[in-house]
Amino acid sequence: MARTKCKTKTVANPRTGVRKTAKDLSEPVRQDAVSRRRPTTLPFVGNTSSRPRVFYDVLAKKNVVFPNVKAEYHYRVRNAPKIDPKNFGTTLPICYSSIGPAKTLELRPLGRLPPHIIKALNDHYVQLTRGSMVPAADLYNNGDHPAEQRIPTMLNENEYLRLIQELEEEEKSKQFSATSSSAPHVNPYSAQHLVNGEIIGIFVIYGTGLVTRAVCSQTREMFTAHVLPEWKASKVIDVIRRLQIPTDISSMTADEIRLSELCISKRMEIIKSNDRYILMNPCESATIHSYATERLDEITENDVMSIYQKVVEIVRFCHSRKVILQNFKPRSFYLKKDAHNKWVVRPCFLQDMSCEEDQSEAQFTRRSVCVPFMAPEMLTAESRTHHSYSTELWGLGVLLYILLTGKYPFHENSMPLLFRTIKFKQHRWPFNFISSKSRNIVNMLLKKAPATRMNLEDLWNQVNGDFPEIRCRSNIILKKQDMIVKMDLFEMYYNTYKDRLLPKNVLPMYEEMKACRNDSTILTEMAKRDFRSIQEQMKRRIETKPTEYQTLVMQVRLQQINQLFFEKEVSQAQKQHRAPRLVQLKCSDISKELLLPGDIYPISEHYHPSQQPVDKVVYKLLSDANSLAFPTVMKGTVPKSYPPPVFKGLDISPS
């Protein structure tokens, strides 16, 4: 019998690019499932002890799973959440400096790359690290809600026409379904729900439910539409009357008028349609939650307190009008910046507010309070007034704790355990760099007994002070994990595209990879040390109050530094033929290790001027002028002189 030669047909996998024959495809599914399994060679943030890392073999193409790894990376990049760098708070996370002073993109090798490559790297990095860079029960990975996306506040003409076209197509499909012989479609919503495409006055409803979006057909502005029960509509109207500007504004101050306009917008409307009361409130593109999510662990304590100060100001105004906010979730406050680059905060949900005398009614029982924000007295069976001014202070404390640390002060997997934790357990602070001033504010607000909590006026006086420019959510462990992901990411991109792209598009990746390797060595050394000692040194540097003699020494040293700055500026101005610009530093701008000698202020073993941007400039100025020694100071009638300081900390300045 003559043998017939059988041709094998090859099939290409669209994702991996690997070609398989029909014989291979006819094999058991077990091997193909193993090949499609998510590879373990991807960068993993967390416990890496149980996951082998064979990146170097993969990048050198010595491993057979390289096509699968590359396909998985490309798949993640395509499905990564996009970040718009034009909006505030959306600085590309791939461009953050892990340690040392923050650097703008123009000062780093990444700044020489084309924008599309930077965006690809950033989307890749965000997909790999979001939700893994912070511990469980955090602000942006708590599992209660999906990730909050930015929404437009104003639709252009094309977007509005596209919306109307989608609504018309949906209406046609509904009419076709109604006239067809198939089974009728049952509306799962009640008559109180808003329906997508419904027109109410000049508003077009966008979405379905009790809370949806609405677009004004005249201005194309985006609103939030809330369906109010009949009993609640009258209560909301009472709140509006108390907060809005009266006809005679002579009795109100300028701040009260400004706060009234923030709480009650002039474009807000309450419309009655089909026995429904609908509250139309103009919305903003960002909330405190979205801003904190975008900044991740790069947010500083000063940023947090500047936003929190605006929230406290809103609460003070509402309490002065006998109105209680009730809802203190970060999602419940819109956030934007005004023309003067200052924060503007206003409440999102007016329907959650209530008047003081309404709290005894059963309809308001725990309706507008999220469980993690409940005060201990609200969880008792004999409680009659479920919300009061003291519970407002507790909610403010929970909000500040979330903004400072990125997670809830009380978190459990079940409601009974959460209730018991709130009532009986004390909150704990993570090993982050948070000043004791902010900790004391939270501790005084989260007192179990309502009578022992800080009152609102004392809180207002406390939040108006100065706070350090230190990343309050950051610690050495997180930064080390962040550096590992960046180093592997840059290395893979460089080895993958160095033979395919122009040198100018791959050499910056190699330089960033080398910088990550240098920083990784520093982070590894810092992580070996006792983290508590680093934290204590940080706290002591921030919070120690100097004595009178220390203040005198600091002022003399500061005069020396400002004089050197002035002389340097004058010489540069003469060379550039311009007027000199006056540079005046304050004592709060410079670390005490540079302002005070080691004899009267012990220098931390972990401190070096290169670790702070201002200290680095001042130290270089003093070194260039050969003026590291302290000037003579009179201690009573005795002149005192001190030698130059000696720093034993790690120098992180680039070599």
Curated annotation (Swiss-Prot):
Positions with a binding annotation for ATP: 206-214, 235
Residue span, Protein kinase domain: 200-470
Entry's Gene Ontology BP terms: antifungal innate immune response; defense response to fungus; defense response to Gram-negative bacterium; defense response to Gram-positive bacterium; negative regulation of gene expression; positive regulation of gene expression; positive regulation of proteasomal ubiquitin-dependent protein catabolic process; regulation of gene expression
GO CC terms of this entry: nucleus
Chief subcellular location: nucleus
Matches recorded under PROSITE patterns: PROTEIN_KINASE_DOM
Function: Adapter protein that regulates different signaling pathways. Required for larval development and viability. Involved in negatively modulating pmk-1 p38/MAPK signaling. Involved in innate immunity, acting either in a manner dependent upon, or independent of, the pmk-1 or pmk-3 p38/MAPK pathways. Has a protective role in response to infection by the Gram-negative bacterium P.aeruginosa, acting by negatively modulating expression of cebp-1, and regulating the pmk-1 p38/MAPK pathway, leading to activation of transcription factor skn-1.
Record remark on domains: The protein kinase domain is predicted to be catalytically inactive.
Protein's UniProt name: Protein nipi-3
Highest classification ranks of the organism: Eukaryota, Metazoa, Ecdysozoa, Nematoda, Chromadorea
Gene name of this polypeptide: nipi-3
